[in-house]
Amino acid sequence: MRTKIFAAGTVLTCLMLCAGCTSAPPAPTPVIVPNACPKVSLCPMPGSDPQTNGDLSADIRQLENALARCASQVKMIKHCQDENDAQTRQPAQGAD
């Protein structure tokens, strides 16, 4: 006796649907953490064309100030990202 193809397909579909009726623990609710950190912007470095030692000294001070401003921007963004990471990990630790 030969089984028709559509009958086998219908039976397999029913078996697959029955497997989906088993009880399983509910999936944890995903935690959405918005990225509220400021955007990274370029850190402009001042150009220089020193003619005297005094000009060179002034250029060095300008460069040091520009680097300090850039470092403070990077530090602020790093701190913001660390806070976001901590908020993301908190619900996962509380679920245990």
UniProtKB/Swiss-Prot annotation:
Residues 1-24 form the signal peptide. Pfam families: LysC. Residues 25-96 are periplasmic. InterPro entries: LysC. Residues 54-78 form a coiled coil. It is a lipid-anchor. It is found in: Host cell outer membrane. GO terms for biological process: killing of cells of another organism. Keywords: Coiled coil, Cytolysis, Host cell lysis by virus, Host cell outer membrane, Host membrane, Lipoprotein, Membrane, Signal, Viral release from host cell. GO terms for cellular component: host cell plasma membrane; membrane. It comes from the Viruses. Component of the spanin complex that disrupts the host outer membrane and participates in cell lysis during virus exit. The spanin complex conducts the final step in host lysis by disrupting the outer membrane after holin and endolysin action have permeabilized the inner membrane and degraded the host peptidoglycans. Host outer membrane disruption is possibly due to local fusion between the inner and outer membrane performed by the spanin complex. Interacts (via C-terminus) with the spanin inner membrane subunit (via C-terminus). Part of the spanin complex which spans the entire periplasmic space. The spanin complex is composed of spanin inner membrane subunit and spanin outer membrane subunit. NCBIfam families: P2_Rz1. This is Probable spanin, outer lipoprotein subunit. It comes from Escherichia phage P2.
